[in-house]
């Protein structure tokens, strides 16, 4: 059976680093075996869901190259949920309850005060039809709970955490539908996973207890549960859960000049001991993706690492990939010359300005000015189409006896206004000969 994964964000905000890592790993898991990666918009929370966030989620996935093979929206699937809900009610697996949030909180506090786990006591199961009728007459509307089977132990072999076991007697029957008829997360998610043919659910370890409950939901719905794997959560560079991580969206990275390939390269390996390899494209990352390589320790996301990977990515980008982002007039030769010195593509503009001029050179002493005047005369006589930097420096070395830094640094400073930068052998041919002579003569 082909692998089918899904990414199921709620459109209540923009994607952050943790969301994107989940989406990427589901995409890699599916593509590793030629399977399908599906997007499901979990928009049952009508009050908080926004269409602008749906569009933002789609745009971010597109930018990252994580193109879904299909899309569903929960808000368009309510008839399916209603049908399955009624089936479970009739089977006795869903029941009505009426406790208010305050009443439930009081029950929890009493249990905790007695040193007992705060498990729902199933008081609502004792209500008779007459009790329900009386509550309805009084205007009380029920919320709905899924009845866990206390005689059916919950186990699964987690793709990352290994064998997992939960005792349903130590779990509360989850509320799956509010009194206003709106849905909570767990039942619609299980219904959709069945209907969409999901074979593998890969998500954060904060969903482990949800998985325990949903496994019984799959069984109650007459379906085989998918394979589950739960990743360790991301932390910041200091090793702690970070509010900044939850706020960092793809737009922030785009503004910083981060390329999508860098995000994919770093997040693909985050949580493993495998080195980040900027040379691997998405297809190669999918081929090497292996859940067994992921550990249970929190995965650290360091923005400094991302910028380092981004520089490595930029150094490999072909001209065709970046041409539309470069300043007017900057061709392939210029990109090839400047590329190794960039951390972000937009820095190419600064170096193109060095090529086109003007530049501001430092103030030189008399001896250096005399050397540069000789360099200007030499430059004026060179064949500019035949490695002018090599010819210029060789002639000056022979004529002045200068070598090393004393030879190269004044020339670089006069020609570019910088002490460091791209290889001069690649950069100098881009500067017009008369402009180079002018700079050396200035």
Curated annotation (Swiss-Prot):
Enzyme class: ligase
Superkingdom as given in the UniProt entry: Bacteria
Compartment(s) where it occurs, according to its Swiss-Prot or TrEMBL record: Cytoplasm
Keyword hit for Cytoplasm: yes
Binding locations of ATP: 243
Motif stretch ('KMSKS' region): 240-244
Entry annotated with the keyword DNA-binding: no
GO cellular component: cytoplasm
Matches recorded under Gene3D superfamilies: 1.10.10.350, HUPs
Placement of sequence motif 'HIGH' region: 9-19
BP term (GO), one: glutamyl-tRNA aminoacylation
GO molecular function, one term: ATP binding
Its EC number(s): 6.1.1.17
Pfam family, one: tRNA-synt_1c
Swiss-Prot/TrEMBL catalytic activity: tRNA(Glu) + L-glutamate + ATP = L-glutamyl-tRNA(Glu) + AMP + diphosphate
Keyword annotations from UniProtKB, A to Z: Aminoacyl-tRNA synthetase, ATP-binding, Cytoplasm, Ligase, Nucleotide-binding, Protein biosynthesis
UniProt family annotation: Belongs to the class-I aminoacyl-tRNA synthetase family. Glutamate--tRNA ligase type 1 subfamily.
Function according to Swiss-Prot or TrEMBL: Catalyzes the attachment of glutamate to tRNA(Glu) in a two-step reaction: glutamate is first activated by ATP to form Glu-AMP and then transferred to the acceptor end of tRNA(Glu).
Subunit description: Monomer.
Name used for this protein in its record: Glutamate--tRNA ligase 1
Gene name for this UniProt entry: gltX1
């Amino acid at each position: 059976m082909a692998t089918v994964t899904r990414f199921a964000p709620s459109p209540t905000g923009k994607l952050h680093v943790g969301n994107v890592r989940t989406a990427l790993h589901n995409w890699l898991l599916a593509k590793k075996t030629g399977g399908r990666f599906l997007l499901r918009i979990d928009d049952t929370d009508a009050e908080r869901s926004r269409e602008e966030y749906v569009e933002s989620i789609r745009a971010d996935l597109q930018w990252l190259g994580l193109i879904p093979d299909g899309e569903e929206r929960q808000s368009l699937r309510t008839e399916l949920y209603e049908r399955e809900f009624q089936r479970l009610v009739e089977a006795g697996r869903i029941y009505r309850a009426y406790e208010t949030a305050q009443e439930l909180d009081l029950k929890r506090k009493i249990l905790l005060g007695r040193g007992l786990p705060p498990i729902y006591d199933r008081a609502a199961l004792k209500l008779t039809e007459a009790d329900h009728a009386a509550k309805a007459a009084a205007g009380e509307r029920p919320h709905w709970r899924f009845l866990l089977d206390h005689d059916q132990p919950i186990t699964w072999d987690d793709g990352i955490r290994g064998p997992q076991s939960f005792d349903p007697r130590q779990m509360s029957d989850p509320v799956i539908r509010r009194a206003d008829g709106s849905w909570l997360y767990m039942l619609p998610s299980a219904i959709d996973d069945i209907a969409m043919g999901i074979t593998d659910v890969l998500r954060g370890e904060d969903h482990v207890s949800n998985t325990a409950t949903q496994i019984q939901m799959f069984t109650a719905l007459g379906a085989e549960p998918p394979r589950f794997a739960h990743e360790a959560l991301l932390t910041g560079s200091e090793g702690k859960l970070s509010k900044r991580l939850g706020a960092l969206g793809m737009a922030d990275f785009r503004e910083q000049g981060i390329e999508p390939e860098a995000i994919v390269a770093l997040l693909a390996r985050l949580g493993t001991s495998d080195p980040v390899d900027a040379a691997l494209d998405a297809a190669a990352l999918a081929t090497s993706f292996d859940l067994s390589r992921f550990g249970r320790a929190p995965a650290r996301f360091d923005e400094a690492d991302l910028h380092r990977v981004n520089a490595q990515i930029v150094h490999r980008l072909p001209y065709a990939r970046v041409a539309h982002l470069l300043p007017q007039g900057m061709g392939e030769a210029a990109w090839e010359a400047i590329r190794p010195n960039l951390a972000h593509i937009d820095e190419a503009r600064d170096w193109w300005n060095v090529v086109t001029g003007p530049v501001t050179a430092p103030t030189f002493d008399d001896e250096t000015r005399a050397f540069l005047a000789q360099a200007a005369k030499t430059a004026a006589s060179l064949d500019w189409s035949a490695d002018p930097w090599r010819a210029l420096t060789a002639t000056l070395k022979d004529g002045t006896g200068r070598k090393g830094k004393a030879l190269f640094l004044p020339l670089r400073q006069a020609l570019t206004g910088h002490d460091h930068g791209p290889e001069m052998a690649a950069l100098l041919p881009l500067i017009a000969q008369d402009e180079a002579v002018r700079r050396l003569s200035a």
